[in-house]
């Protein structure tokens, strides 16, 4: 299955280049709902809520070369508490330097202040009476270095004066997996209740792997789970959990209960994203000005993020959505998946604004800075210039 990321806004040549040569080349700073930017390397003196009922503590997590889930697991171990005691507004990239607000309950400030983990900083600790929930942010500010630009483009003076005010609102490759873009395929199998195929796709099916990992995935495909378990490394924790859980229950669906609930949800979310990206491609041919029958958000046409309670558009957009719906043989009721969650469905803008976009070309490095609303992908912005997905 492709990722359905096909079209561009800009009618220009793409100049290639390398993203994320170093973690510092990709800085992501969360923007809180009130517009406060959680800046890398700086602290904010948040006022404690008074009176405080003792429920929640919020803090800023600054991390380098950690994904959000692994960083959180490390903090859980360091504080000797449980994963369910923590929440966050949104996940962040791994090979990057990022900030994000997190919340917890059942901990003392002193426990957080004592955490010492390489490449992780806990700061801006605040007592709060409010639970931090997924989506409790405006968006993110990005500062991105693009290196190794094709030589013929380095001489163009306009690299320091690039313009972009909106992009196609694709879900980026991160939603599908940078190293192994198969998350949406696993999600489709889960939606279809084909848990055996989901298991083999996630644990087997080598793509670009080499060495022990490639051999381990080949062993999974051949049914030699014990052999695969011996070869998978620490970096394949979730594959190992799935196999061990399968040994325990001899049931492919039960195997997935070994994974964090958020990860199981992400599989189905990725399938929804795959379908949405196809809607962007189909709508591209008609333009993104509002048309009769469109469902608008901020005067921008939206597409269906298909779930069990999807509201379809009318007119041309409605026809696009129903065509994809029928092509995929969708049954909305099947988005209620026992042990995985109820995937409600919503609407999402087909294009999205890019705020405060700036470019600077210096010493053979192009630096782009901009802000995006939550749920939007910086690599879709950089792709407009480089032609690369990530």
From Swiss-Prot:
Keywords: Isomerase, tRNA processing
InterPro entries attached to this UniProt entry: PsdUridine_synth_cat_dom_sf (IPR020103), PsdUridine_synth_TruD (IPR001656), PsdUridine_synth_TruD_insert (IPR011760), TruD_catalytic (IPR042214)
Protein's UniProt keywords contain Cell cycle: no
Source taxon at top rank: Archaea
UniProt keyword Isomerase, yes or no: yes
UniProt record, GO biological process: tRNA pseudouridine synthesis
Gene3D superfamilies: TruD, catalytic domain
Annotated HAMAP family: TruD (MF_01082)
Name of protein: Probable tRNA pseudouridine synthase D
Species of origin: Methanococcus vannielii (strain ATCC 35089 / DSM 1224 / JCM 13029 / OCM 148 / SB)
